[in-house]
């Protein structure tokens, strides 16, 4: 039993950041509860209250009571919380203690003093459940974002805690691993574990979760069962920042005629040090000035293709009409929003991030871009003080400010609610209207339906399918996301 009784919390040094206001919530043992709501509504703060990170790590002004099995969590020793509660953070990289997957999977058991034979058995069973055998023996630095997310989920599962707290666990997962995650959550539920999931993607949880608790500005808006959620008006849910509970209802937006010009990629072959070739694209073309969705499973080399396209990795050539662009030219004309935006935010304020991205810094134009993405109030904030979804939008704002000809966005809607996903979709459409070619590496089917016009499907470093999105092909796209 987890009880949150009239709790309010404000982070130290920032009274507006992730505040929870007079929140009361009771979660009986064995329930699966989804915390939902728009970015910055307080979901992550609630998870930190439940796992003791507040106030042990995140300091601030806390009132009210948080109890786990009748005990005040603020008075429980950390080792006891760690034994009973497993947490997966919004950014899995921030919870890794090792440099390789095997050590990370066994670390929690070693830390709790389990015998070696038991550790080996627990890791083996967890690896089998998560179907991550191919990730064993690998460097964490060489994994894709989705692969890191699976290792993070598996590493906390190894100790079999009674309470599992997951913060955006599907944000970087492909459709296959979302299905695996859903089955694991079902298994936890059958075992009587209490599972709390902070999530924007709701469709994979509607047949598992007991309750959906929606927050807005740190307060509870509703507490509904899955059946009650499905009966809600979609416009009402969208206004609260919620994604669709049923992706079968999605329809593509009417697409205009594709342009006659093409972008062609030749000899895009690449391998990381001491590894076999992961990208093997000999020759393929896509229409120019379109929004192109790059889809495929985690580890398919989608991000590697994006890095090669931008010239970050030295591979192949791109032809745009009569122009041949080698990697040095592509570095000048391409802009990439990385999968982990923490790698590319390094100034003292959000405004400065946009200004250094511009050829000719223009504060008024920067303010207009921030307003377009709902970031005006954060102009003077330090980027690292923002939530994961807010950082994501700042990185997208820098892409708009850069005015480059070719834009690559790697999981641009990771951790974003419905409202902000739509804002990103509008920005991508704006880039298209300005004559830019946009490549979107994504697992977000809702984003694809809102703005993308063409699909390139990559698996094992090769293009296995490509097509324009229209009424004749949208079932092909939808079935890929439903049937994996």
Where are these regions (language model features)?
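Conserved ABC transporter NBD signature motif
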Residues: 59-71, 314-331
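Conserved ABC ATPase "signature" region
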Residues: 118-135, 363-378
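Conserved ABC ATPase signature
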Residues: 139-143, 147, 382-386, 390
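Hydrophobic anchor residue at the start of the ABC signature
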Residues: 153-154, 396
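Catalytic Walker B motif of ABC-type/P-loop ATPase nucleotide-binding domains
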Residues: 164-167, 407-410
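H-loop/switch region of ABC-family ATPase nucleotide-binding domains
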Residues: 199-200, 442-443
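Conserved beta-strand-loop-alpha-helix hinge in the C-terminal portion
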Residues: 219-241, 462-483
């Amino acid at each position: 039993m987890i009880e949150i009784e009239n709790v309010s919390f404000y982070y130290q040094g920032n009274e507006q950041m992730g505040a929870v206001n007079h929140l009361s919530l009771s979660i009986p043992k064995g329930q699966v509860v989804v915390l939902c709501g728009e970015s910055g509504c307080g979901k992550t703060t609630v998870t930190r209250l439940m796992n003791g990170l507040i106030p042990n790590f995140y300091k601030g002004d806390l009132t009210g009571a948080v109890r786990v099995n009748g005990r005040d969590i603020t008075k429980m020793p950390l080792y006891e919380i760690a034994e009973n509660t497993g947490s997966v953070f919004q950014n899995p990289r921030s919870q890794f203690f090792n440099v390789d997957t095997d050590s990370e999977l066994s670390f929690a058991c070693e830390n709790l003093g389990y015998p070696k034979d038991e550790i080996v058995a627990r890791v083996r069973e967890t690896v089998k459940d998560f179907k991550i055998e191919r990730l064993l023996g690998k460097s964490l630095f060489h994994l894709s974002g989705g692969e890191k997310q699976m290792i993070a989920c598996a590493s906390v599962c190894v100790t079999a805690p009674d309470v599992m707290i997951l913060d955006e666990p599907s944000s970087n997962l492909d459709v296959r691993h979302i299905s695996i995650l859903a089955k694991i959550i079902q298994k936890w539920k059958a075992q009587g574990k209490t599972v709390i999931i902070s999530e924007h993607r709701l469709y994979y949880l509607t047949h598992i979760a007991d309750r959906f608790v929606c927050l807005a500005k740190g307060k509870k808006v509703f507490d509904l069962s899955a059946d009650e959620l499905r009966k809600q008006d979609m416009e009402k849910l969208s206004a609260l920042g919620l994604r669709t509970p049923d992706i079968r209802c999605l329809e593509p937006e009417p697409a205009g005629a594709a342009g006659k010009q093409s972008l062609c990629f030749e000899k895009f072959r690449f391998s990381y040090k001491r590894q076999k070739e992961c990208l093997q694209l000999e020759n393929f073309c896509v229409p120019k000035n379109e929004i192109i969705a790059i889809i495929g499973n985690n580890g398919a080399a989608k991000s590697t293709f994006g890095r090669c396209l931008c010239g970050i990795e030295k591979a192949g050539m791109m032809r745009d009409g009569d122009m041949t662009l080698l990697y040095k030219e592509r570095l000048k004309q391409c802009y990439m929003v990385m999968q982990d935006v923490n790698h590319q935010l390094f100034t003292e304020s959000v405004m400065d991030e946009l200004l250094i991205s511009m050829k000719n810094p223009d504060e008024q134009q920067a303010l207009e871009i921030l307003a377009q993405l709902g970031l005006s109030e954060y102009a003077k904030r330090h980027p690292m003080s923002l939530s994961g979804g807010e950082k994501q939008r700042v990185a997208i704002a820098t892409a708009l400010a850069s005015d480059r000809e070719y834009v690559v966005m790697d999981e641009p809607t990771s951790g974003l609610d419905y409202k902000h996903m739509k804002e990103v979709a509008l920005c991508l459409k704006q880039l298209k209207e300005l004559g830019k070619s946009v490549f979107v590496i994504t697992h977000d089917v809702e984003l694809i339906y809102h703005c993308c016009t063409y699909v390139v499907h990559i698996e094992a470093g090769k293009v296995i399918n490509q097509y324009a999105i229209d009424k004749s092909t949208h079932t092909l796209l939808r079935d890929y996301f439903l049937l994996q």
